Amino acid sequence: VATRARAQSDDKSHHACVYCFARPSHRYLELDAGVDFDRQIIVKINVADALRKDLARPSWSREHVALGTNTDPYQRAEGRYRLMPGIIRALADSGTPLSILTKGSLLRRDLPLLAEARKQAPVDLALSIAIADDELQQAIEPGTPTTQARLATVTAAAEAGFDVAVFMMPILPFLTDSEEHLDAALGRIKAAGATSVTYTALHLRPGVKEWYAQWLHAHRPDLVGRYRDLYGDGAYAPKEYRRWLAARIKPLIAAHGLERTPEDPNTGTVASRANARDDEGEWRRTRAYGDDAPAPRAEPLTLF
């Protein structure tokens, strides 16, 4: 991905998504990756001032800055602290391209500001919408806005003139990977006004796997054995599953007209997210410059 830097206004997430890959980073604050991650939110109240200082450095060459690559910039705490407007203004004033990925419908508050920022620097917006089943969505993403609220945010952003991408991440094996679910989700996303969809299968790194396994035992014990087969010895679903998923979802994405345009309209170059896919067409996250959490140990876990 053509992204060098990441800015965050807070650490950890009131969204409490069971599958969140950022959970292990809470351990570096001497907090756990489960309940503490969901309830103990660290707010960086001076983030806009600190960012302006960084952007003023002679060494800063206006690389693309991604907001929302680790934890969500528009979770509930943002409604109180209003940190994102200062971040957006700082980036725009310096001519720094920015992108925002969020589950938060609070993004709508800042659409006028983002429209103004786009006059000074490229702005890329994306909503994370992975689950079309409302009951499942509230069970596994209990602190997030509903799927319909996020789709309404897609519509609002599109009406404000943005090309809005949707990240269907993660696709949950045996829960959201059926053709019926995928087709219904893509239909709603298209109707909302999104222009493209990017997807990936569930990734269970150490620290996340334990929490997800606990949820699975409580809510879907019938799937424990099947998850053991997929994730018992590693963090990623086997290549065979990912290839199967690609063969199922890519034709559906194309049928709904949601394939990502290979050229970025802001720069005239290949879109960065188009470069961020593996051989099976899945999105792969690259480590952003400035990430403060070291990579977890690659050790097998047998929790399912």
Predicted features along the sequence, with ranges:
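A structural motif
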Residues: G95-T96, F162, A194
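Short beta-strand segments at enzyme active-site cores
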Residues: A66, L101, V164-M168, V197-A201
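Conserved strand-turn element in the central/C-terminal portion of the radical SAM core barrel
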Residues: A132-D134, E141-G143, A156-S178, L202-L204
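Conserved Radical SAM active-site core
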Residues: V1-D11, V18-A126, A130-Q138, T147, ...
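Auxiliary Fe-S-binding modules of radical SAM enzymes
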Residues: D177-F304
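Active-site glycine- and acidic-residue-rich loops that bind
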Residues: S105-R108, L172-D183
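Surface-exposed amphipathic alpha-helices with a cationic face
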Residues: A115-R118, V154-E159, K250, A254
